[in-house]
């Protein structure tokens, strides 16, 4: 199976590393060679740390890196069996990418997006193959986190769902099948918790440290909601909250003003 990934950021490079570590050859695409080189260097650094800690052998690291190839040209995707888009969370950009891919890739190619909250069905509608369009939502850091949300759009075929579930399992991941809905499963529960933590802090109820410790010790969470928001990125949290609020129109999903203020200030 020829697997191609678009994007060299945290998620893009992480997804590439996850496939490569599962001994699956993968092509990583970006507009610039510099971005590709930076992503490969990041993956190499990650693997080197694992070797130094004795968690993987040098031979395994070498084999993993050998599974990764790079390109700046969409023409390399013509014979791809699966293309995963891991670009930034902008609907317009995702539509632009898949409109272009639809012209280049063979009719059998499965398209997947790693979106954390946007509509699979809406992105799929810009292509001629909505039955072969699916969500494949990895979690950060992708090489480590076991979960993959497999999201079925309005027209995604059962056959494609089965193929992607099997692929995720073959990678060593645990996939969950999700019918498309705003935020899917994890982010519909998780991100409002981060938003509420910000609200509790803004109301002067407790300090950042005490809010996080309360949830770690009281709810057995490995990380508090405010630390988690910093890990995810407050800009990402805001984008997901806005999707939830716009789709449901429910005040419980309204982004807290402090979250908006921090994002505007560049405190991500």
Model-identified regions with their sequence ranges:
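Structural motif
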Residues: 6, 29, 64, 71, ...
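Rossmann-fold dinucleotide-binding core
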Residues: 110-180, 184-188
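Rossmann-like NAD(P)-binding element
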Residues: 35, 49-110, 117-118
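Helix N-cap / loop-to-helix initiation motif
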Residues: 32, 57, 157, 206-210
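NAD(P)+-binding Rossmann beta1-loop-alpha1 motif at the extreme N-terminus of oxidoreductases
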Residues: 1-49, 53, 69
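NAD(P)-dependent Rossmann-like dehydrogenase/reductase catalytic/cofactor-binding core
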Residues: 22-24, 162, 169-180, 202-203, ...
């Amino acid at each position: 199976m020829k697997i191609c990934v678009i994007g060299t950021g945290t998620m893009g490079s992480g997804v590439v590393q996850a496939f490569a570590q599962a001994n699956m050859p993968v092509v990583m695409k970006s507009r610039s060679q510099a971005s590709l080189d930076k992503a490969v260097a990041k993956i190499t650094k990650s693997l080197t740390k694992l070797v130094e800690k004795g968690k993987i052998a040098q031979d395994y690291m070498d084999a993993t890196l050998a599974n990764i190839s790079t390109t700046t040209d969409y023409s390399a995707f013509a014979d791809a069996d699966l293309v995963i888009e891991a670009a930034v969370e902008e609907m317009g950009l995702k539509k632009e990418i898949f409109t272009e891919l639809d012209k280049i890739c063979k009719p059998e190619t499965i398209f997947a997006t790693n979106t954390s909250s946007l509509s699979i069905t809406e992105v799929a509608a810009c292509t001629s193959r909505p039955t072969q369009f699916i969500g494949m939502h990895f979690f950060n850091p992708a090489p480590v986190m076991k979960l993959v949300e497999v999201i079925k759009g309005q027209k995604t075929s059962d056959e494609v769902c089965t193929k992607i579930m099997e692929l995720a399992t073959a990678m060593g991941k645990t996939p969950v099948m999700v019918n498309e809905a705003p935020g899917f499963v994890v982010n519909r529960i998780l991100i409002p918790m981060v938003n509420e933590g910000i609200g509790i802090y803004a109301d002067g109820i407790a300090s950042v440290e005490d809010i996080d410790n309360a949830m770690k010790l009281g709810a057995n969470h490995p990380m508090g909601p405010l630390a988690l928001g910093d890990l995810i990125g407050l800009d990402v949290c805001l984008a997901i909250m806005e999707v939830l609020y716009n789709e449901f129109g429910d005040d419980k999903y309204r982004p807290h003003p402090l979250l908006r203020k921090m994002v505007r200030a560049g405190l991500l």
